[in-house]
Amino acid sequence: DTRSLSITMTSSSARFPDITNHWARPFIEALARRGILNGYPDGKFRPDNSVTRAEFAAIITTTFSKIPKKREYVPFVDVPDNYWATSAIKKAYETVFITGFPNNYFRPKDRIQRINALLSIISGLGMTSKVSTDLLPVLGQIYQDASKIPDYAKPTAAITTRAGMVVSHPNPKLLNPTLAATRADVSAFVYQALVWLGEEKAIPSQYIVDPSKFDVPTPPPGSVKINPKREFRGAWVASVWISDWPSRAGLEAAQQKAELIQILDKLQELIFNALILQVRPEGDALYESKYEPWSAWLTGIQGKSPGYDPLEFAISECHKRNIEFHAWFNPYRASTSYRRVKNVSPHIAETNPEVVYRYGTQLWMDPGAKVVQDKIYNVIMDVVQRYDVDGIHLDDYFYPYPINNLSFPDSKPYAAYRNAGGRLSLSDWRRNNVNIMLQRLWKGINSAKSHVKFGISPFGIYRPGQPAGIKGLDAYEALYADAKKWLQQGWLDYIAPQLYWRIDQTAQSYPVLLRWWTSINSKQRHVYAGNSVARLDGKAWKQREIVKQVGISRSLREQLSLGNIFFSASGIQENRQGITDKFKSLLYKEPALVTTMPWKDTIQPASPVAVQAENRKITWATGGGEIRSWTLYKKSDNNWILEQVLPKEKTEATVEPGTYAVCAIDRMANQSAGIVVTI
């Protein structure tokens, strides 16, 4: 029985005969005195035995028993009510110390890895927003095996090292991130967390990794390190059905450009920092493509050029305004209506009609067909390689939304799969088709341009009952979208669940769903809630609903809820129910940079050089490297207030008297040290 590690203390003795000369003895004895650890029936502790996830849950909940509940428990299918650790697992989940695996499994008997034990502790204690990740650039100096740290866990390694929580025996230069944590390891980690909390005194040990021994890049003389306000502030711009842009098909190029500039000017005025523009609504293209025809939503005729490249134009105009550009693709939809427009080659309905099915009035590509999988990959990678996009974005359309009494017509390819020896059920096969596509895209994008972000905005309900009380469409079974798996496998950089429901809508409650999405985020990706300004009607949906929803998103920042994306731009343009006024006066009063992604890049750019001040004008020059923009801060008491975000081409600013700092921002939104100047 391995359950002797924690929960209650059955002996008043704090000594175990097999730890007398063990490196972890002081940590073990200290925790035993607190009633956190106990030994086996034979009196031994067995410090080098590995720890299971169930045992770890028991230790954590005993040690940090005062941490408040942060989310509702969703019972795991492999943790029965009568299991010895069910209560501990439930509490560890509710307090965000630990999460599960895809398909609602917990795997209680799996051994917990050292890095995941550390990740669990900092998640439950909310350390991600309290401890600096400044050691990220020097992890390779600290740990000889830094290359073995999974990308998702690098911030964990930096935070726990900075907090003095990492203890490594016999060699503190090895983190051994993926090794199973031993009882001794866990004892040391937990004790060091108590030291960080101020609840225990430090124990001298040569195996504690001392962060002060390593050089972190320091700001140059006359400079200052500033932690900027960060929040993802995005808006969707839909082209399908003439939703947001252009206002109608067939407009002259100049008018199309003017309309898009009007949208971007409004977003800039409201201090948004990201645009998600639909560039492939139905197997077509709002850009020059050798793979697919020009979209009829642009010109009224599929295949007809609008006379310019809207994608290239949109990217350029966004970057002038310090707005990130994310290209939005619909992967499988071939036509919103087979009657609406004549498809022309190279539309897939013309080149490969055998893999395009009529479903209701729509045309839909078969996600299981290799020609479709290759087409999607080639189309998206073509954009990644040829255009200066900041992100690639997929929405909620995978397999089509179901039509009553109408099955998706892929019985023949599924039968062929089974005849070839495939064993997956139809539902699992369909989900696997989508998974293959997403994983391939994730790898391809990172290989081609590692700075390009990959995000998905799935339907806001994963499955009814997850979490408890939630009702609605089962995206897992109806759309074959296993968004929980994508997030937990780390196949994306951000997820933007479409939470188009009110806070008081019990069966689809906004805060309940958002907390659930943040709770399953074991790879520590970013969560940007999708909000609907399109629903504002002054009746069931009033302006204050959006205000409260943004507040809820911000309250979950420690759980990596780091922004919002609004559907859609037309509602913002119209100032529907006064929401635009509210953005300006309350929600987005101050500028903010987009959030950084430590698993992609953490290297700060060079600071600006030749910074001078004269006649209320500050001028500067680039210090080298690729710069996306500049930030200008003004000092107020002991705080630095972000005054302006300027495009890279602008290297001067006229200001009022005061003390300022100018910083460089790279394309991943990493910020340099600020160069201080006084006027």
Where do the protein language model's features map onto the residues?
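Conserved aromatic anchor
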Residues: 615-626
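Substrate-binding cleft of secreted/luminal carbohydrate-active enzymes
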Residues: 480-506, 518-600
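Beta-strand-rich modules
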Residues: 653-671
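Aromatic-lined carbohydrate-binding/catalytic grooves of carbohydrate-active enzymes
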Residues: 270-306
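Catalytic domains of carbohydrate-active enzymes, especially glycoside hydrolases
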Residues: 258-284, 386-390
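Polysaccharide-binding and catalytic clefts of secreted carbohydrate-active enzymes
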Residues: 280, 321, 351-461, 465-491, ...
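Active-site-adjacent "subsite" loops/lids of carbohydrate-active enzymes
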Residues: 227-232, 238-258, 327, 332-386
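Feature responds to low-complexity, polar/acidic, surface-exposed segments characteristic
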Residues: 3-25, 33, 38-54, 60-88, ...
